[in-house]
Amino acid sequence: MKDRIKKLQKEKDVAILAHYYVDGEVQEIADYVGDSFYLAKTATKLKNKTIIMAGVYFMGESIKILNPEKMVHMVDIYADCPMAHMITIKKIKEMREKYDDLAVVCYINSTAEIKAYCDVCITSSNAVKIVSKLKEKNIFIVPDGNLASYITKQVKNKNIILNKGYCCVHNLVHLENVIKLKNEYPNARVLAHPECKEEILNLADYIGSTSGIIEEVLKDGNEFIIVTERGIQHKIYEKAPNKKLYFADTLICKSMKKNTLEKIEKILLDGGDELEVNDEIAKKALIPLEKMLELAGD
């Protein structure tokens, strides 16, 4: 099937992008694999007129907003991120009325409608850098409260206001499981994603995005306790097969696992449904996405 997909892809001039959390076999046929920020940046540089996104819905939306002239397909249109819906436009409007000198910062894990009401987007790989550069004193970060809490510790000259959203995978990591792994493997370093709760991050030797965690594993050291979605192991073992990884809890995103080779082949054969974003919303949502790319500077 992989050979058929690559043949069809070449014939139809289609670029396949995949997030680190999708199954390894999907990552293997993708042209580009990375975290949310890398995929958003990469999409703006592609010459292909059609993009297939193996990830969750907000990723495809962001790519379509940044590339309105391209045809964008989700591998599974129902692969959604629950956290993206854990903030409302009403709440954002209330915060703008309550605070002067306020910037509304949205994690890229948000809907296009929410982005349209925000000032700048962030990802876990550039959040601290971007928030540090904002001129506003008050910063309302949506929708992820755990990421916002982490940023609060890193950017101390801002009044960061937290929302109550969370990642359904990272938020369920059990503290006792991480402690147990640390006791079992005392030489292993703990690498955690900032979507985890503070009690988990307090045990981490390194906190960073999926790309950051991979880079950290590829440095010195042989044993690592990984506190993020298990799909990340595919890229790590591809680059460093002898590293020993120990995962805290199950850590599987069911939405990411909806992306399959069968669905990709079907899109290449039949066309599939094109992802569309309302023109007015897309125009407004483009502003925070472009500001993110500008402030991230890489």
UniProtKB/Swiss-Prot annotation:
Iminosuccinate binds at H19, S36, Y107, I108, N109, S124, H193, P194, E195, T210. GO terms for cellular component: cytosol. [4Fe-4S] cluster binds at C81, C167, C253. Pathway: Cofactor biosynthesis; NAD(+) biosynthesis; quinolinate from iminoaspartate: step 1/1. Signal peptide: none annotated. GO terms for biological process: 'de novo' NAD biosynthetic process from L-aspartate. Catalyzes the condensation of iminoaspartate with dihydroxyacetone phosphate to form quinolinate. PANTHER family: QUINOLINATE SYNTHASE, CHLOROPLASTIC, QUINOLINATE SYNTHETASE A. NCBIfam families: nadA (TIGR00550), PRK09375.1-2 (NF006878). This is Quinolinate synthase.
